[in-house]
Amino acid sequence: MRKPPIISEPSNKEKKNILFLIASIGGGGAERVGTRLVSEFSKNHNVYLMYFNFKEKTFPISPNVHLIPFFVTNELKKEFYPKVKDSNLIRILEIEKVRRRYNIDITISFLFSPNIYNIKAGGGGIKILSERNDPEGKGDSYFKEMALAYEKADKVVFQTNYVKNKFASEIKKKGVIIPNPICVSCLADKIPKKKIVAVGRLVPQKNHELLIKSFAIFHKIHKEYYLNIYGIGPLLDQLKILVYDLGIQNYVNFKGFCDDVHEKIKDAEIFVLSSNFEGMPNALMEAMMMGLPCISTNCSSIPEIIDNEKNGILVEKDDVSGLARAMLRLSEDEILREKIRRNAMRKSEEWRLNKIVSKWEELFY
């Protein structure tokens, strides 16, 4: 385990001591974005990454980043008991110690609990909180608690105007729009296979039921196509039953989780996102950057990513026949696919890592 060196003062006036708070360094899209950003920040700043949950699989991180894992174990609780019984308070007290020890200038946090810790912990210089979700899917209590935290923050980073505009004017004034940085390992094949793909957790939010029902209609006309779904989740068995009930079990494949998903989907003809709500979906943006023609439900912030009929096709939520028609259009119109592919790649230039890092660094001074 790497131990961070004590730095009493930045060696360079322009360098900042930055503490980054996140739940873990493995798992979901927010964690992947967070680890990618801190690795870039560490090229110009002293960066400390504090995380609170253990994950077996972790995302790659630059060796320049000083890792500070802090897991509240039963043994650790005994050290604080009976004065402190709350695990969250133990984390907050540790954040305060880290801020003092490393003379932190800026503290950045991702996701709900780290955002709360950032605000409640003393010290830490400039406090930048980042909203990574659409509050619509999180409930009223989540929204109210985050709004209270944002009121106390110095800056709040939103991924989209759609989410930013849900908050009061005082919060919007300190809000900044910075999309996710997107990186892909390969581009789409020039000659695709008869394949439709989707990438996402098998949970109600992603609404794979809509996708499967639409594909069943589409498949009656184009029997040569296959649907590959990448992702794991609690709805797997339920979705498999639906596939069998629709009689398309030989044409729908549940591929599970894979590290090299870009390589797996690059030969597809169409990418589909069928979600009920989204923050800023990395899977869709990565598919666009690869040059895959994309269809998405018209939900949450998606219209800020897809300009309908130009760089993708939008369909309404839960519109089974509408999604089937969109699949038919793209599969049968090569000129439309090429136009959408080209415009999607042009749009994705906005999400290049160097551009996103520059926007973040503007907040540091």
Can you name each region flagged by the protein language model?
Residues 2-7, 11, 20-28, 32-36, ...:
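N-terminal strand-loop element at the rim of the active site
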Residues 31-36, 194, 198-220, 229, ...:
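A conserved mid-protein helix/loop that constitutes part of the nucleotide-sugar donor-binding site
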Residues 91, 109-115, 131:
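Short His-centered aromatic/hydrophobic patch
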Residues 162, 181:
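Carbohydrate-associated surface elements
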Residues 240-256:
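Nucleotide-activated donor-binding/catalytic signature segment of Leloir-type glycosyltransferases, i.e.
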Residues 257, 276:
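Aromatic "clamp/platform" in nucleotide-sugar-dependent glycosyltransferases that forms part
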Residues 293-296, 306:
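Short hydrophobic beta-strand element within catalytic cores of glycosyltransferases
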Residues 308-309, 313-320, 329-334, 349:
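Conserved acidic donor-binding segment of nucleotide-sugar-dependent glycosyltransferases
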